[in-house]
Amino acid sequence: MEGGMAMWVYHSPIGDIFIKRLSDGRYGMIHNGTVWESCDSPQAEADNVYMHVTGCYDWDRLDGKIYDVPSDLSEWEVC
């Protein structure tokens, strides 16, 4: 991951999930070193994590089973 770029982290039950600005200007959802998807804004990416629609099976399968998922990017830790 390149330094100096905006990045957020959510310490989830499956491990850390990051939202990071990618080299193409989009924002990616990263877990275990894999970019699972990307969106035009970090808020849109945070919404996808909240809704469990990321393409990451380990995360998406927990839909309805976790009740403290950040509902807004402002609830993510800036790193």
List PLM regions with ranges.
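Mixed-charge, Lys/Arg-enriched low-complexity segments
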Residues: 2, 36-79
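Short, hydrophobic/aromatic-rich segments at coil-to-beta transitions
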Residues: 2-9
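Short aromatic-glycine-(Arg/Gly/Cys) micro-motifs in beta-strand/loop hairpins
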Residues: 11-35
